[in-house]
Amino acid sequence: MFAKLSARGIATRMSFLAQKTASQETTAAAGSRSELVYARENKYGAHNYHPLPVALTKGEGVFVWDVEGKRYFDYLSAYSAVNQGHCHPKIVAALTAQASKLALTSRAFYSDVLGEYEEYVTKLFGFDKVLPMNTGVEGGETACKLARKWGYLEKKIPANQAKIIFARNNFWGRTLSAVSASNDPSSYEGFGPFMPGFELIEYDNVSALEESLKDPNVCAFMVEPIQGEAGVVVPSDGYLKKVRELCTKYNVLWIADEVQTGLARTGKLLAVDYEQVQPDILILGKALSGGMYPVSAVLCNDQVMLCIKPGEHGSTYGGNPLGCRVAMAALEVLQEEKLAENAFKMGDLLRNELSTLPKDVVSVVRGKGLLNAIVINQKFDAWEVCLRLKENGLLAKPTHGDIIRFAPPLVINETQMRESIDIIRKTILSM
């Protein structure tokens, strides 16, 4: 029996190699290299994304190149994960040096890198402790678990009665917990039953927030300082300050989801810094590794963090030496190259120029730093605009039908910014 299985396996591998060779030989006849990339993904991959039709093979700084060799401005930055620019040499060097030494230990043992990283990141952001994870959604899950545990141990909420409040149109991932907090049908339909104890209120509505916090079973309010996936929705001035005041007043933890807005993207190290307030729990991700490796972090003070005991939460990869070394290098780049300051300056330039575009095509321009969006009037199609931008050498993606997010890497200089603005203007005027 095993001999037959082995023979089948060899035959399958030989068949695969033959097919691969035949495929390579017929590349020219089958179509462009990009089309072959699309076809392979479509055949063998899950259909859970709708990517722009461009097949990328290289990135450097603010630019990416497709498999045909065409260069583009990257105005998505992997949803703000590549703040430091593609393949930043300092981050690449940190990755390769650590990868050749020690990549993973799990948390079953100590490593000589994790403590160094923990000290660095807690001092930088002003918290007692950090719990290292890998992805942004893991950070959100971690924050929710911390908040619930704190609610039971410290606030004395009755068992299994803790509630977490979220803002409508939030987005923090695709896990069951994350979609349980969503009011977007494309995120939650067909995936119930949902996580209990999650409630939604309007974003940027102080009265609604205060009313919800009066419930003694509420342990936390989790909110993005600027709603990214919703279309770069910037709250009113003073909103975050009121969030801080109300959460303190009602003994509720404020969880700031800075996975997309944090790490210099909005022109400050953190978006909450605009109002000089500190959340009880801070979630970081994406650019924490400069797009080089999945790294996320949840930071808070001892009163909250020490509610979690050994064995109650963790991750095999969370806090691994490779991720820690990469994250420290990525954070150093933000500071050494003054990328928050550059994002602030370049963002002002971008919004000022975008505001001159014809109002019959672009009805709204909004954002902070280099997290920006335009709203396309309904008689035009945002997807079609993005296709034309691609043809003209700039990559961006629509969100929610009529909104296009503009978020280039923070290393962009003024010459590059003006060149990319010219592409946007040319494209919009052609509509």
Swiss-Prot record:
Enzyme class: transferase
Pathway terms, separated by semicolons: Amino-acid biosynthesis; L-proline biosynthesis; L-glutamate 5-semialdehyde from L-ornithine: step 1/1
Reactions performed catalytically: a 2-oxocarboxylate + L-ornithine = L-glutamate 5-semialdehyde + an L-alpha-amino acid
GO cellular component term, pick one: mitochondrion
Requisite cofactors: pyridoxal 5'-phosphate
InterPro entries documented for this protein: Aminotrans_3, Aminotrans_3_PPA_site, Class-III_PLP-dep_AT, Orn_aminotrans, PyrdxlP-dep_Trfase, PyrdxlP-dep_Trfase_major, PyrdxlP-dep_Trfase_small
A Pfam family this chain is assigned to: Aminotran_3
Enzyme Commission number(s) from the entry: 2.6.1.13
One Gene Ontology molecular-function label: identical protein binding
Membrane-spanning residues: none
Entries under SUPFAM superfamilies matching the protein: PLP-dependent transferases
Domain of life: Eukaryota
Subcellular location: Mitochondrion matrix
List of residues that carry N6-(pyridoxal phosphate)lysine: K286
Keyword terms, alphabetized: Aminotransferase, Mitochondrion, Pyridoxal phosphate, Transferase, Transit peptide
One GO process term, biological-process aspect: arginine catabolic process to glutamate
PROSITE patterns membership: AA_TRANSFER_CLASS_3
Protein family per UniProt: Belongs to the class-III pyridoxal-phosphate-dependent aminotransferase family.
Oligomer status and interactors: Homotetramer.
NCBIfam families for the chain: Orn_aminotrans
Name of the molecule in the record: Ornithine aminotransferase, mitochondrial
Native source organism of the sequence: Drosophila melanogaster
Gene for this chain: Oat
